[in-house]
């Protein structure tokens, strides 16, 4: 063999060796929400846009939950380093409250997880694998909100990226996800958000013959009225009693298990419509517009799986947070306007009602909870990590005024911080109450882990509903929603009395007569095929104070559903219903009040 041939052979051997080494450096990413057995862990998709993914939450109210488990296929035998993406949600000079461990083939990995602040990868330990498929489990150690986003098995020394676009791209690569959904489905109307407003819109449109996609990121419908959050519905039916009575609630105490019966009624009634295509446990993650028209909404299952691109000539944003509008470039507002912008003063309450200068303060979010009285006493563990919030406050139940908002916190971007703050308030206040012997037999029965939001983004329509509209009390030519409920705006009690906990609010009630909301507040002024209904409708901060309750937002949804039917009939957008077909639309709305349940 000549020198040149020997060199070629040497380099070929070296390249093959390197190729083999590279192929052996392999990693497997397992999304925790995709575990086949969730055990007592819950899928929490509330904060995907901030931290990157749904995650598993060990919401045991102080009692460790059953293990989550799955099978993991590994590409080669050998040693693997195991990482978990997690977070210590209450860092401080105490043991982290959400601690857990990873088990592989029944063996507990050495490192306790959930101990470092902020979302990041924590090293669980190293394993030796001599089989293609291994059993993996998450073992909760506390019952206090441990959380796991994902596990990563790697036979290299790499550390996965922590957050942001680097993590998103890395995650997409590891999961081999396509750049865009490979499945497309087309409907007459796509409704994103299955609260009372979204359900009412879907029913109204379906009854008019439209094919409707209803996308909702929870296993049950109703939003704040669902059995998962348990707020009763307030407001009047307006002209839509037949539809709204199918999906509303009795006036049970907030947090009551009676919400479960109303949940069953709601789910059954929506599922009766064959042309409502229900996508429960699906979360929208992207929308795009072109020429001021929403082109599509992309959504995926909250427990993992193939995504779908939803197309339609019409879309309804009833997400509460205005996500479809936000992604597609719709104009929106957030926070409190200056008192001078719309003339919304209530002199008696000054800055607490409407500020001199605009700010980021909004009505806050709540977490409802309840206790039961058992036959025997049961201790509740010490929660030192909660006491900085609860301080000396004692309670054995929560109500609507357990609410948190702060000018430096954004109700969407800081949602997880706000939720966790409320959990600290609950656990700490209950611990304090348990120190009283009279409360020895009290036990936590139910604590929601889902934020009940009141206010965040408000999409802007052709008409912005304000306090002035309430004071005027005049009907519009396109009045489709009516209400008699007082305008109530919330503020934190600490603003009046520094001795009060920061998680309790107070409401200011402005008594009023009947007022009306025009159809023009229910479609975007710059995205020409986008409706909105619910608390993200077109209004000012004070204007939201009355009609944010759920029978009223349900009226909005029903009005949108009927408008969508005429949009289809004439091949026009939402605005043209007002400019070209208003009489026919209002006649259709008017007929609904005589169509009793």
Where are the model-predicted features located?
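N-terminal Rossmann-fold NAD(P) dinucleotide-binding loop
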Residues: 198
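Extracytoplasmic
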Residues: 25-182
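Bacterial Sec-dependent N-terminal signal peptides
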Residues: 1-25
């Amino acid at each position: 063999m000549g020198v040149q041939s020997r060199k070629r052979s040497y380099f070929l051997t070296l390249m093959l060796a390197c190729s083999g080494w590279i192929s052996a450096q392999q990693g497997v990413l397992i999304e925790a929400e995709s575990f086949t057995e969730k055990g007592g862990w819950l899928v929490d998709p509330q904060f995907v846009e901030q931290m990157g993914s749904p995650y598993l939450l060990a919401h045991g109210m102080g009692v460790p939950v059953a293990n989550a488990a799955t099978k993991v296929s590994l590409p080669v035998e050998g040693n693997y380093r195991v990482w978990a993406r997690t977070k210590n949600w209450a860092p401080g000079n105490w043991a982290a409250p959400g601690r857990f461990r990873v088990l592989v083939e029944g063996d507990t990995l050495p490192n306790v997880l959930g101990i470092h602040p902020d979302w990041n990868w924590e090293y669980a330990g190293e394993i030796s694998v001599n089989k293609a498929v291994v059993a993996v489990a998450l073992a909760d150690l506390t019952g206090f909100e441990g959380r796991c986003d994902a596990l990563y098995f790697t036979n290299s020394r790499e550390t996965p990226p922590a957050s942001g676009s680097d993590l998103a791209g890395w995650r997409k690569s590891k999961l081999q996800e396509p750049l865009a959904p490979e499945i497309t489905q087309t409907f007459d109307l796509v409704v994103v958000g299955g609260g009372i407003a979204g359900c009412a819109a879907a029913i109204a449109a379906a009854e008019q013959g439209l094919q409707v996609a209803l996308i909702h990121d929870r296993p049950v419908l109703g939003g704040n009225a669902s059995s998962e959050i348990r707020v009763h519905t307030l407001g009047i039916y307006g002209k839509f009693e037949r539809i709204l009575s199918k999906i509303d609630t009795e006036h049970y105490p907030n947090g009551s298990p009676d919400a479960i019966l109303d949940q069953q009624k709601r789910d059954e009634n929506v599922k009766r419509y064959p042309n409502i295509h229900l996508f429960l446990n699906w979360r929208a993650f992207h929308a795009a517009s072109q020429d001021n028209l929403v082109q599509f909404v992309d959504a995926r299952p909250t427990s993992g799986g193939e995504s779908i691109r939803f197309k339609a000539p019409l879309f309804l944003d009833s997400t509460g947070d205005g996500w479809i509008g936000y992604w597609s470039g719709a104009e929106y507002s957030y926070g409190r306007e200056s008192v001078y912008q719309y003339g919304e003063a209530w002199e008696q309450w000054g800055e607490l009602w409407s500020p001199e200068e605009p700010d980021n303060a909004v009505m806050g979010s709540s977490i409802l909870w309840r206790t039961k009285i058992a036959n025997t006493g049961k201790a509740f563990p010490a929660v030192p990590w909660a006491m900085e919030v609860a301080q000396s406050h004692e309670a054995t139940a929560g109500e609507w005024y357990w609410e948190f908002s702060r000018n430096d916190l954004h109700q969407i971007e800081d949602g997880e911080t706000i939720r966790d703050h409320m959990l600290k308030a609950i656990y700490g206040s209950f611990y304090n109450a348990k120190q009283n012997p009279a409360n020895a037999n009290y036990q936590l029965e139910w604590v929601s882990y889902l934020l009940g939001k009141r206010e965040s983004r408000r999409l802007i329509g052709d008409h912005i509903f304000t306090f002035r509209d309430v004071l005027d009390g005049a009907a519009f030519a396109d009045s489709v929603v009516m209400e008699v409920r007082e305008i109530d705006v919330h503020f934190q009690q600490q603003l009046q009395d520094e001795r009060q906990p920061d998680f309790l609010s107070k409401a200011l009630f402005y008594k009023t007569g009947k007022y009306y909301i025009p159809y023009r507040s229910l479609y975007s002024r710059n995205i020409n095929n986008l409706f909105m209904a619910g608390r993200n409708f077109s209004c000012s901060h004070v204007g939201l104070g009355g009609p944010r309750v759920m029978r009223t937002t349900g009226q909005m949804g029903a009005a949108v559903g009927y408008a969508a039917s005429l949009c289809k009939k004439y091949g026009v957008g939402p605005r043209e219903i007002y400019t070209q077909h208003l009489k026919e639309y209002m006649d259709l709305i008017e007929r609904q009040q005589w169509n009793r349940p």
